[in-house]
Amino acid sequence: MKLRIAVISAILSASVTAYSQEPGPVISESSTLTIEQCRDLALNNNKNLRRGALEVRAAGYQKDEAFAAYLPAIDFAGGYMYNQKKISMFDSDQLLPIKTFDLEKQGYEFNIVKNPMTGEPITVNGQPVPEQVAYLPKDALSYDLHNVFFGAVTLTQPIFMGGKIVAMNKITGYAEELAKSKLDNSARDVVYAVDAAYWQVVSLRAKQALAQSYVNLLDTLSNHVALMIKEGVATRSDQLTVDVKLNSARIDLTKVDNGLVLSRMALAQLCGLPIDTQFTLADEGAENINAPAVRGDSPIDMQDVYDRRYDLRQLELGVKIFEQKANVARSEMMPNLALVGAYSFSNPNIFDGFKKKFNGQFSVGAMLSIPLWHWGGNYNKYRAAKAQTEAMRMELENARELIDLQVRQASYKSEEALRTRRMTEVNLAKADENLHSADVGFSNGVMTLDNVMEAQTAWLKAHSEDIDARIDVYLCDVYLSKVLGTLDFTTPSLRR
């Protein structure tokens, strides 16, 4: 049936990712594991859960990183530069005209060389010639800047970033919730896979005992036929018919033995144990496994189911994240304002005539950035984010519809499994009675060998169907608990 195929797929996919990372309980050859112990082993040793715990931790760090954007950023930058040449303010020595105080004019005037005959200023190349000059050598304004050290300590405090910082903090908060939800959902998947593997082993162990009983029946029948041949009331053909059935039953028993070994290996791997670990399960060999409690006929509150489903919670968080991404895109169309401050210094410094010592100054200001025109790029980015948000909402609605269908299917399968279990119990009693009647009739000579083998085949089929029905009740109940979000288990400390 489809459910059993899904169960086997879950076992195989989950067993690939399970391995032992923490020392668990010591498992000896005489150890008996309950289903709760198998769950605990798997939850403590599953690789996917370990990875999910690290993702939760990383999401927490990213949330702290986003919060830091509210606070001022303090940075230091420094450097060294070698210059090949000195810096000079003049290309040569300079002669600067000077002024003297004129008593008549009550002010400073340039002393100009005048012609003693005419009293007119003497000019050279059209420029008057001063009587006195100040000599300013080139070296006086040349500075040794071969080795320059510089640095600055800066502070940047965001004041208004268009809502980007607020949106990023919400995104990282939702991302942390999303990582936790994924971890819980993965734990639920692991528990479901372990339960499926557990009951698979129990089922095969019961079928192994059934196959052995069937072999014993045929072996006993073969011995009876051999005695009847000696007495002349049976033929060689009857003996061969029984022997063929016996060999076929032994082949089936071998297949069941191999399947049981492989199923134990799959369960051991899920539990994080070496695959060759020898252990028994608490429900192995139980004559009557108590069926799970029958659920009431009260209607299922789908809103409660939605609230308990981690996968649906992930989609809801995805919608919120995309909403905030749209806000981030919108912030790029809004002005950004930040307060900036700095202390800069250098050696040689410009405050003391380029002396070779450190000196610096403080500076404070504000920086405003206003996007003016980007040819619609930012606006299209915002519209794309809004479209992605709507697409995520549609995916969320579709998921709710699929969950409705999934819950109904699981409920029907659970009810079907219970009805099948009741019918197999009736068939089992009839098959046992039929086999007993056939054995008695064959011993009294009123039943043929074919009648006995038909009764044995019907007995085998009835017992096999009963085993499948009992296990299906558990598998369907676990699956229904999973889709309802009520699969109970104790989550280990994975988020440390």
Residue ranges of predicted features:
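Acidic, low-complexity, intrinsically disordered peripheral segments
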Residues: 4, 19-27, 75, 82-109, ...
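Bacterial Sec-pathway N-terminal export signals of envelope proteins
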Residues: 20-88, 275, 281-320, 371-372, ...
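Small/polar (Gly/Ser/Thr/Ala-rich) solvent-exposed segments
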Residues: 50, 74-88, 138-146, 156-185, ...
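Periplasmic alpha-helical coiled-coil/stalk elements that build and connect Gram-negative outer-membrane
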Residues: 61, 181-304, 413, 417, ...
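Residues on the lipid-exposed face of transmembrane beta-strands in outer-membrane beta-barrel proteins
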Residues: 80, 153-157, 267, 343, ...
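Hydrophobic, lipid-facing positions within transmembrane beta-strands of outer-membrane proteins
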Residues: 149-155, 301, 362-368, 410
